[in-house]
Amino acid sequence: LKQIPVSKLDVILPGRPRSYRQLIYHIFNIPEVFLNYFQNNTPYTYEALLSILPNKLKDENDLYDYAEDIKLRFESWWSNEGKNFDFSKPANVYYGEVSFHEVLERTAWHSGQHCRQVELLLKEKLNIIPKIALNESLFYGLPMPSNIWDNERSFSENSYDGQVKEDLSIKE
């Protein structure tokens, strides 16, 4: 993630109103929401996953420190609580009552999908070869989307500008 140039962090991504900075935050906010729910019984809501940047993340170092803190927190949780937890227990989240296994799985593939997007952005938009390449075997057993970008056409466009473009070639 540190390979994204600081000058590009606030550039808006193709096809959606989110910057590189917001995407990086979102990647780590997803497991933070999971951990907060698991450890503190904080409600697991759609709004919590909107990943609105907090004011405390003033610069890139704050963002990278946040990411490292979440990574270490997750590793500690897994070592101390997670690996022995009964993930078949029910979890009540914004999309219904599911098992903790399903919530953890969704956390993994959701953040993983956004990591795939960062890798694609580095290569295709920033012309940077990622120092660490994501191997698809990392996601073995996870229900990863087939497309890295939700709409491959939108990825080839310029940054999202908030305007809906009509395709005049489609007639009713």
Model-predicted segments: where are they?
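A short, structured beta-strand-centered segment in the mid-to-C-terminal lobe
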Residues: 55-70
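Short, contiguous alpha-helical
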Residues: 6-53, 89-157, 161-172
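Residues that form generic nucleotide/phosphate-binding pockets
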Residues: 37, 66, 77
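Exposed alpha-helical structural elements
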Residues: 33-34, 62, 73
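Proline-centered turn/helix-capping motifs that create local helix->coil transitions or kinks
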Residues: 42, 76-86
